[in-house]
Amino acid sequence: MKNNWIIILVLVIVIIAAVLYLIGYFMRKKNQEQLDELEVRKEALFDLPVFEEIDDIKKMHLVGQSQNSFREWNQRWVELSTRSFAELESQIYEVENQNEIFRFMKAKKAVVEANETMTEMEAEVEVIRNGLKELRESEERNSLEVQKALDVYEELSKSLKDDKASFGPAYSEIQKQLRNVEIEFTQFVTLNTSGDPIEAREVLEDAERHTYELEDLMKRIPPMYEELNETFPDQLKEIEEGYNQLLADDYVFPEQNFAEEIQHAKKRVENSMADLEKTEIAAVEVANRDTATAIDALYEVMEREIEAKKYVVTNQKIIDDYISHSLKNNRQLMIELDHVSQSYTLNNNELGRSRGFQTEIEEIIRRQKDLEPRMKEHTVPYSEIQAFYKECYKILDDIENQQLEIDASLKELRKGEKVAQEKVDEYEFRLRSIKRYVEKQRLPGLSADYLEFFYVATDRIEDLSRALNKMRINMDEINRLCDLCEDDLELLDKKTKDLVNAAALTEQMMQYANRYRHTHENIRAALDKSMYLFSTEFRYQDALDEIGTALEAVEPGAFKRIEDFYFKNINNPNLTAI
């Protein structure tokens, strides 16, 4: 039994030893694998072309802030590749040592620390490389800008040499400024080489700025010089020669200082040329705009007088004829007005207006006579004559239109008289027709109101007839009377129809109401009163209202039924009183 326990104990120890061995083996293997991975990462890190990237940037000859940035990134790389690398190597050695002596837990901790160091180094390298990349790209861009400025400078030098004549008096100043730019670029190279990056950068910025300013200057000067050297002188010469020729051709200019304006423009060109020599471009641009405006104004004055002469030559005879035509028409109009005024009253001041036309035409003739000697002596500008002619056209056109209007109104007077005479005949016929119509009804009589209105209408027609038979007819009064007669007859016609219809309806209502005379006292009384109003006072509408009201009280709807029947058969003499 004791031997069995010994065997079991030995087996347990063997098993435990085996398990511990296996655990140690696997832990050692795992630590070694992590160590191998760490070695791979370390090799990969130091295989990165950081040294080459740093060397490439060194060759770029950085200056100023760029050089400071590069020094910072380079220092961080030096620290990483020395101090951090040494620390990493120490940690790797520690892992290997602990792993060899089976201190697996310490080895594992050392592996973790080494991995952390490795991760930090990888992150730092990434930051350094990105910084170097950005610095390189920035410098490449700057180099391109510098090269671009140098290319512009070279182009400007070539342009100045090839197109010397296009810069005129500004050539010397431009050449001087170009030489200054060249000196600045040379100074930049010297300072950059000698190791003064800050001042070198400032000089470079000045050189670039002056280069582009000079480029702008050299673009703007040639067109300005062309204006001052060719365009303006040629135009002023043309204006001066044209002005002298126009004076020789007897033109007169209202502008007394025309020749002085030419000299002022010439002087402005001279001053601008002096400013151009000093490359005072802003002043030259303003002056050239003013000069161009002044020259345009001079051209405009000459063209105005040339066009005015053409207008005067074309319209001179037309104006003379037009004045004669207007004068003749007005005389004829005044004769016609005098003749018409013997038969008609003129209500629109036609005679006064025609006398006003005469005064206006005579004023035009007077002004024309004042101009004639000045035109012959060539002491008046054509533009002044043109303005007078245009004013004449406006006045004469207005007179012509009013003359035609008055002439048409005179013709309308005769037409109006004829129409009014026809209306008198028509009104008299309508009045007689109404009278015959009323007589035909055989009414017992007519009310005073109706007769009064009938006589008013009759008197109005007689007034119209008398107005038409006067020695001088007032057509305004006649037209007013015509309108009143028309209104009177329309109203009389309505009153007549109302009167006749009321009388006829009263008779029918009374005839119908007789059936109730003996049975209804109110009907009997209404019949008596209605008969009195009808036969004695001839108030047919009142009689109708009286009997109609009583009948409606006895037999509702009877009044409306009889009225409807009457108007439905009003044109049937067998069924109605009419």
Swiss-Prot record:
Segments on the Cytoplasmic side according to the record's topology features: 28-578
Extracellular compartment segments: 1-8
Signal peptide positions (record): none
Bilayer-spanning residue ranges: 9-27
Compartment(s): Cell membrane
Keyword vocabulary terms for this entry: Cell cycle, Cell division, Cell membrane, Coiled coil, Membrane, Septation, Transmembrane, Transmembrane helix
Pfam families per record: EzrA
Topology in membrane: Single-pass membrane protein
Keyword Cell cycle: yes
Keyword ATP-binding: no
Role according to the record: Negative regulator of FtsZ ring formation; modulates the frequency and position of FtsZ ring formation. Inhibits FtsZ ring formation at polar sites. Interacts either with FtsZ or with one of its binding partners to promote depolymerization.
Family to which the UniProt record says this protein belongs: Belongs to the EzrA family.
NCBIfam families per the UniProt record, alphabetical: PRK04778.1-4
This protein's name: Septation ring formation regulator EzrA
Gene that this polypeptide is encoded by: ezrA
